[in-house]
Amino acid sequence: IDDIVYRVTTEMGGIPAPLNYEGFPKSVCTSINDQVCHGIPSEDVILQDGDIINVDCSTILNGYFSDSSRMFMIGDVSPEKRKLVEVTKECVELGLKEIKPWSFMGDVGAVVCQHAAENGYTVVREIGGHGCGLEFHEEPWIGYHTKPGTEMLIVPGMTFTIEPMVNAGTERI
């Protein structure tokens, strides 16, 4: 996966943002099964039927950073893993629907956390979404344990990620 991301990113004129960022050794983050985030891809780790994997791609293009994270199911996954992946996607979609000028980041976080909880899951507290643009990680920080009408005001032109880490267990890493 890392080789493909590096090759395609550079062929399209981009730079893989994670590569050498704070010592990170690869071009993409891959987190398998119960690993929360920022996993380091390895040729020694072979994906198995039933695994779930998060692929977190970030690119620098024309001086601007982008960041996108997606979950994938490998082969025949258990009903528990399938539900986790589906609810996580729903959390992202519900969060995105809350984004509009003059709303609040707390609106986004609250709906994400509520949907996860309604389905028996938690959302990690320590890591959240973030702004991206001229820097890899910039303001605002998007937490998911928030209340509607609180946190930063969303204004036109802001760019940020909605990347909730939804867990089947504790809200801690």
How should these model regions be labeled?
Residues 1-173:
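Active-site neighborhoods and metal-handling regions in enzymes and metal-associated proteins
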